[in-house]
């Protein structure tokens, strides 16, 4: 068992050794290192072939046509290209966008930028379980609504939105639907032949591939058009210029192929470990799970331990690599905006920890985690005057705190 135990797979995943091995064959002089756009010699042809294979592997993962895959530097770029690209290309059709308050910062900040450019954005409230009711999306739709952007799996609480129904609704109204699948691609089945989604953002490093690479699925039938955000040599059919990073793309492709092959067995094992972890900590008094327990990705568990400060708990859990909130915002001491949107108060949001389990988590890891969590909570609550008051039956909401 390696300490600290890594339970932060929603932040990033280690590169699968099979992926790393494949990548190494596309870097050095004795490998396939050429520029895929070099059409005049063998080095370029070999690199182009490697990229074509990777494109097909990513397409196969979501049952798409290989021509619908645009390679990017990651999900953040894919999201920017999707949302800004649609908004700018179709601006004469309308300037209204619908999203939710619990989206990733990449979506929220892109929408904020468009607001500065004169677009109007509706940010939907989720239910207390993290799910967005379909009727709420429909009620927000207007004649000038151009785009709906809703994530498939939430990065903090792991809830799965009903993207099948959202896609049907958007298609029936002639509105473009973008889905952020950074947390679901390679972990949950996605079939674009069944799903009426127009754009899908995909990340490499969330599915045991390398960091710094991702993809955007852009539907061909009905055809979706985008305005490029990166100008240059006209790579990726003019949608994303820049020399293709062969080794990165080979890694992304291999990760996608492995994910497709191992998804069922991976998830069965991960679900067993997740259930074991939850069963090991749920007996702790004043412990709550955040987000819907049924409509949830099996590798994610967001738990609030009331009367324990999240940051002190993380320090106490030094043997566990976990986070409070997403990795992108965990450096700030603000409570998670996702948990606040679910209606949690500051104290409960601050006392939450995200545990995310993955391909390389073991039974032994979970046993150790349960032991460490239980001991740490007992120890921290022993030092907490609020816990003492709560145990004495004092209603803390009624206490008038004096300011000094």
From Swiss-Prot:
Q: Which cofactor does it need?
A: pyridoxal 5'-phosphate
Residues binding [2Fe-2S] cluster, per UniProt? 328
Q: Which residues carry this modification: N6-(pyridoxal phosphate)lysine?
A: 206
| Classification via SUPFAM superfamilies | PLP-dependent transferases
Instruction: Give the record's GO CC terms.
Output: L-cysteine desulfurase complex
Coarse class of the primary localization is: cytoplasm
Active site at 328 (cysteine persulfide intermediate)
Q: Where in the cell is it found?
A: Cytoplasm
What would be one Pfam family of this protein? Aminotran_5
GO terms (molecular function) for this protein are: 2 iron, 2 sulfur cluster binding; cysteine desulfurase activity; metal ion binding; pyridoxal phosphate binding
Output the superkingdom of the source species: Bacteria
**What chemistry does it catalyse, as a reaction equation?**
(sulfur carrier)-H + L-cysteine = (sulfur carrier)-SH + L-alanine
What keyword terms does UniProt attach to this protein?
Answer: 2Fe-2S, Cytoplasm, Iron, Iron-sulfur, Metal-binding, Pyridoxal phosphate, Transferase
* Involved pathway(s): Cofactor biosynthesis; iron-sulfur cluster biosynthesis
Main enzyme class: transferase
**Binding-site positions, pyridoxal 5'-phosphate:** 75-76, 155, 183, 203-205, 243
One GO biological-process annotation of the entry reads: [2Fe-2S] cluster assembly
NCBIfam families per record: IscS (TIGR02006), PRK02948.1 (NF002806), PRK14012.1 (NF010611)
Q: What does this protein do?
A: Master enzyme that delivers sulfur to a number of partners involved in Fe-S cluster assembly, tRNA modification or cofactor biosynthesis. Catalyzes the removal of elemental sulfur atoms from cysteine to produce alanine. Functions as a sulfur delivery protein for Fe-S cluster synthesis onto IscU, an Fe-S scaffold assembly protein, as well as other S acceptor proteins.
- Name the family the entry cites: Belongs to the class-V pyridoxal-phosphate-dependent aminotransferase family. NifS/IscS subfamily.
> HAMAP family from the xrefs?
Cys_desulf_IscS
Protein name stated in the entry: Cysteine desulfurase IscS
User: Which gene underlies this protein?
Assistant: iscS
